[in-house]
Amino acid sequence: MPEVQRMTLTQFLIEERRRYPDASGGFNGLILNVAMACKEIARAVAFGALGGLHGKASNQAGEAGAVNVQGEIQQKLDVLSNTTFLRVNEWGGYLAGMASEEMEAPYQIPDHYPRGKYLLVFDPLDGSSNIDVNVSVGSIFSVLRAPEGASAVTEQDFLQPGSAQVAAGYALYGPTTMLVLTVGNGVNGFTLDPNLGEFFLTHPNLQVPADTQEFAINASNSRFWEAPVQRYIAECMAGKSGPRGKDFNMRWIASMVAEAHRILMRGGVFMYPRDSKDPAKPGRLRLLYEANPIAFLMEQAGGRASTGRQTLMSVAPGALHQRIGVIFGSRNEVERIEGYHTDQTDPDLPSPLFNERSLFRASA
C-alpha cells in the first residue's frame, strides 16, 4: 500500500495563510522558528544523561542549584531550552520582544536584528522536575501583537488578556515529539519525523470530549483547597454510590503539557486551583506563558478553561509572572466546577461530603 501523504507544518501554514490574502508571511516564519527551537530542545531531551544535561544548573559561583526569577531550582535543560528559544527566534525579524519563565524582565531584540510586530512569551521547559526520571516534558508558547511604534518593549506591552493571543501551542517531548498548535482556527497536532526533521500533521482538528470520568489534581494539597474544589473531588471519589453516579479515575504527572495533551487526546479535567497553601501566591501556574496558551488551545478544541470564577482568557494580567488558579478540560466538568464556585456561600466551610466520603478525610 502507498504511504499516506501527510501535510507538513510548512504546508499547513501556507494553507492557513491563503485564507488571508493580505497576510505578509511573517507570522508563518515566526511559527516555523518556534518549531525549530522545539526540534533542538527535543534532540537535547532525547540524549538525556548521554548529553550531560541531567541535573541542576550551576549558579554564578559554579555550584549546582541556580535559582530562576520564580525562586525555583533550575535544571540544566531549563537553561539550555531558554537559550535555544532566544537564539532561534531573535534574528528572524518577526518579533519586537520576548518574555520567558526563566527571565525576570522582557528580552529586547538585539539592535543588529530587524524588529517585527509580534511578541513571544514562553515556558521553555515545562515539567523540568521530571527530566531526571525520564517523564514527558514540554515547551509552551504564546504569540501576541506588539504595540506599534515602540523602540523597546516593556512589561506592560505583554500584559494582554488571553483573548488577545494570535497563536499558542506546545511541544511535547515524549515517546514521540509532537507540536500542538492553534492559530485561532481549531487545534492541530503535528508529529516530528526524526529522520526528516519535519513536523507532519497527524492529529487534525482535535476536539476535547464534553464529558469525562477522569480528573487530574495534586491530592497532597487537599487540605488547602477551597470548598468548591473539595466538593467536586469528593463527589468524584464517591463514584457510583455518590451524587455523580459514576466512577472516576485520577491522574497526576506534574507536567502540565503532558496533562493537557492527554486531555486533548481523550478528555478529562485538570485542576491546579487557588488554595491557601501560600497566601502570597493566588495560584501555582503562571498566567501569560502557561495558563493562557493552554486555555486558548482548550477553548479552540471545544473545551473550557477557567479560574473557577471567570474564564482564564478574560483575566486582565497585572504582572509578567503573575500566578493564577487553573482549571481546564472537558467543558461540562469545568462548568460544573464553576457552578460550585458560584454556589459557594462560606469560603471557609467545606462540603460535608468531603469529610464523610472522601479518601482525603479530615482527621477527627
Curated annotation (Swiss-Prot):
Free-text remark on how the cofactor is bound: Binds 2 magnesium ions per subunit.
UniProt xrefs under InterPro entries: FBPase_C_dom (IPR044015), FBPase_class-1 (IPR000146), FBPase_N (IPR033391), FBPtase (IPR028343), Fructose_bisphosphatase_AS (IPR020548)
One Pfam family of this chain: FBPase
Biological processes, Gene Ontology terms: fructose 1,6-bisphosphate metabolic process; fructose 6-phosphate metabolic process; fructose metabolic process; gluconeogenesis; sucrose biosynthetic process
GO cellular component terms, semicolon-separated: cytosol
Residues that hold Mg(2+) 2 according to the record: 123, 126, 290
Residues bound to substrate: 126-129, 218
Enzyme Commission code(s) on record: 3.1.3.11
Enzyme's top EC category: hydrolase
Alphabetical keyword list: Carbohydrate metabolism, Cytoplasm, Hydrolase, Magnesium, Metal-binding
Pathway: Carbohydrate biosynthesis; gluconeogenesis
Main location: cytoplasm
Subunit architecture: Homotetramer.
NCBIfam families: PRK09293.1-3, PRK09293.1-4
Protein's name according to its UniProt entry: Fructose-1,6-bisphosphatase class 1 2
Encoding gene, per UniProt annotation: fbp2
